[in-house]
């Protein structure tokens, strides 16, 4: 038989047993929560273990796996993504923004090697693509501003010429200044006279002096200073004459001056490539070459030199002449100068004057690629020797 509850409903087997109203105060029994909606449950819950030990619940021990911590990546990548997302969001807002930009070019290198694409940003600001990465610190050199006094002091130091540029410089003969042929350069400078311009006196009708009664008054003369007396007694200064241009000197005048002066002077004498004279004899054996014939026999053939090579060997040069007197200089009454080399006559004329310095240097080379250079003197004049064709033709017709 099944028992019913207070409400008259049958109880299910194995379910919680209904409590009676009279059993509310029993010890160790927890009443079931009332089903009436108007009643609240008790604040303190009752224990059904009847004072026994609580049952332990066992939980499995899970072994935690150790994971090796990897170094964190730089946060700059996230920052770049955030900046790009912001730029994309900004481009979408507003009117006329975020439009695609098209750049047309004919070649790859048309914009130049250092030209970079520029992206249009907000607030009408151009942003380089290179600026999208992490910002780098740029050290800007600060220029020091000079005051007016420092600038004036630098100019004074530049204008100075009373100091030695090299403090360790010593007086050495090898460091002497170069001499240039500017002895007649004084005519380039203009000198002004200190005396005021005096108008020339024009001769006119002679005027008669008017007779005037001279009063008998004597003027007392004051003593003069020594400087004034010295100026009065000093002779007048001679007027400086500006040197004129150097005169064109003929060969005859030059040779006469050189014969009268005691100082020795070097002359540059230009001679023809080929000189009259006998070239030195050279014992040269003929060159023989072996040629194999059709029959297999070897034949020796002498090779003769070309005509030009023979003429070059028969020519006489200055190096082929012996040391000593080469010829004679003849000075005619007309001023013509000739050089006699055996039976050949050469005309001697003045060469073109040089505007630079010429020196005769003797160079002596050693075996170990070293040598010495000795300056023998300055060369001031140049003489050119050319063949006299009239005398050559007369000598040929004879």
Swiss-Prot record:
It comes from the Eukaryota. Component of the RNA polymerase III complex consisting of 17 subunits: a ten-subunit horseshoe-shaped catalytic core composed of POLR3A/RPC1, POLR3B/RPC2, POLR1C/RPAC1, POLR1D/RPAC2, POLR3K/RPC10, POLR2E/RPABC1, POLR2F/RPABC2, POLR2H/RPABC3, POLR2K/RPABC4 and POLR2L/RPABC5; a mobile stalk composed of two subunits POLR3H/RPC8 and CRCP/RPC9, protruding from the core and functioning primarily in transcription initiation; and additional subunits homologous to general transcription factors of the RNA polymerase II machinery, POLR3C/RPC3-POLR3F/RPC6-POLR3G/RPC7 heterotrimer required for transcription initiation and POLR3D/RPC4-POLR3E/RPC5 heterodimer involved in both transcription initiation and termination. The modification Phosphoserine is found at residue 42. It comes from Homo sapiens. GO terms for biological process: defense response to virus; innate immune response; positive regulation of innate immune response; positive regulation of interferon-beta production; tRNA transcription by RNA polymerase III. Its main location: nucleus. Belongs to the eukaryotic RPC4/POLR3D RNA polymerase subunit family. One of its GO terms (molecular function) is chromatin binding. The modification Omega-N-methylarginine is found at residues 95, 97, 99. This is DNA-directed RNA polymerase III subunit RPC4. One of its GO terms (cellular component) is nucleoplasm. There is a cross-link at residues 68, 78, 141, 152, 160, 190, 199, 206, 220, 285, 302, 310, 396 (Glycyl lysine isopeptide (Lys-Gly) (interchain with G-Cter in SUMO2)). The gene is POLR3D.
